Amino acid sequence: MRRIKIFDTTLRDGEQSPGASMSVEEKVEMALMLEDLGVDLIEAGFPVSSPVQFEAVKRVASAVQKPIVVGLARCVEKDIDAVYEALKDRPKDKRMIHVFIATSPIHRKYKLRMEKEEILERIRRYVGYAKQFFDLVEFSAEDASRTEVPFLIEAYKTAIEAGATTINVPDTVGYALPDEFGELIKTLREGVPGIENVDLSVHCHNDLGLAVANSLAAVQNGATQVEVTLNGIGERAGNCALEEFVMILKVRKDKLPYETGIKTELIYPASRLLTHITGLIPSRNKPIVGENVFLHESGIHQDGVLKHRETYEIMKPSDIGRSSETLVLGRHSGKHALRKKLESYGIKLDEETFQKVFEKFTELADRKKEVYDDDLFSIVSEVLREPINGYKLVHFHVHTGNTLLPTAAVVLQVGDEKKEAAEAGNGPVDAIFKAIDKALGIQPKLEEYIIQAVGTGKNAQGEVKLTLRINGELYSGRGVSTDIVEASAIAYINAINKYLIAKGLLRKNGGAE
């Protein structure tokens, strides 16, 4: 069987999905999970784009051991320098730079305003420049699927001659059909001089729902590497979903003689961790990881599954690490039991972080008695978020009822400074938001508000993820509590703190400016 490399770009392209931003600590923990999952390469970010992106790539590179860590760069000298600075301490055989430039007519005319020869010269110059610092260089022709094939062949030929070790073919806007994308890969395999000496990679977007199908067609026509994201997250409609591509190869190995290094029993835990970190919940009918995948409502289906699971299931829940045993721990559980449970899901924490998780676990166990898997994922993702020592909710009081005008009073504190306010609203959540606005003198616009249960049962926690627009910019916040009003207030304050820090109105170590 032919081995297919899995290039995971959850931390880079996946994070570009609206609302999916991750802190440095969250990226590091997700990278450790991806390493355990068995991916071959991890694209950790775009270092030149921001100090946070640079730090994330640098930290991921120092945290993981086995995968090749990749940084993204345009065909621009400062981009390449930034990737090198972020990855220079990593062994040469475990670091890669991914350089790209658009090649399609529409990009040449409207975005780059360059002629073909100018683009070829940039490829020659900057792939060569990257090669001075990296043994492993991936080159992508952005929007390859809408590029004239003769020019695409010339672009890849130029990149290989300049030192590229991987050639990546992106279907950037998810435009290609499987048969034509497969034919394109075959044409490149046969027509690009030197391509037999490099990896041939594909990067498919899901705008027409064909990212996985196009990736499979590419592999069937000679691709040796597939770029994916967990849960298929990514810009617009997302990317080729890791879990779908890998499980198709596993379930249909009778027709697809390819294998990967993915430990499929860690797919579901990895998916759940990402969900809790980003707040992006896969649809219930999402293949492989959706909540409905192993549920059967039809009486005929239920009868068949009870008699023999394979009547209506082509894979077992255990194949992806999914267990029906969701109740895990309680108030009398100790550190050893908690650590063992976390490690069974591939979650490895340093001692300081684990201690914080344990403290929050014991607090939660005292409040709701029974702690479920999703509770643990939520606690871990909460602890991993970079601490923002801004305003904290010290006290709140809500007065509401079906015959009363809902009112809320809040006390907020940052450093030694306290602010108090009370307001009425259209419901308790609206009232507490307005009280916070009044206390801080800010008027955000609520763009998105999502609440979901964490765990099961009447005493489940509520997790709130929201997005605020403040002065034209978006800021996300997240809060978890057994009280949904409190969870909402925590998330709201979290988003406002991000705005205040970004604008220099609040010091990161606490205190208003």
UniProtKB/Swiss-Prot annotation:
PROSITE patterns named among the record's database cross-references: AIPM_HOMOCIT_SYNTH_1, AIPM_HOMOCIT_SYNTH_2, PYR_CT
Pathway listed: Amino-acid biosynthesis; L-leucine biosynthesis; L-leucine from 3-methyl-2-oxobutanoate: step 1/4
Xref: SMART domains: LeuA_dimer (SM00917)
Entry's localization field: Cytoplasm
Gene3D superfamilies assigned to the protein according to its UniProt record, in alphabetical order: 1.10.238.260, 3.30.160.270, Aldolase class I
Residue span(s) of domain Pyruvate carboxyltransferase: 4-268
CDD domains attached to this UniProt entry: DRE_TIM_IPMS
GO molecular function, one term: manganese ion binding
One matching Pfam family: LeuA_dimer
Keywords: Amino-acid biosynthesis, Branched-chain amino acid biosynthesis, Cytoplasm, Leucine biosynthesis, Manganese, Metal-binding, Transferase
Any one of the GO BP annotations: L-leucine biosynthetic process
Region entry Regulatory domain, spans: 392-513
The protein's assembly and partners: Homodimer.
Function: Catalyzes the condensation of the acetyl group of acetyl-CoA with 3-methyl-2-oxobutanoate (2-ketoisovalerate) to form 3-carboxy-3-hydroxy-4-methylpentanoate (2-isopropylmalate).
Family of the protein in this entry: Belongs to the alpha-IPM synthase/homocitrate synthase family. LeuA type 1 subfamily.
NCBIfam families listed in its UniProt record: leuA_bact, PRK00915.1-2, PRK00915.1-3
Name listed for the protein in its UniProt record: 2-isopropylmalate synthase
Source organism of this protein record: Thermotoga petrophila (strain ATCC BAA-488 / DSM 13995 / JCM 10881 / RKU-1)
Lineage: Bacteria, Thermotogati, Thermotogota, Thermotogae, Thermotogales
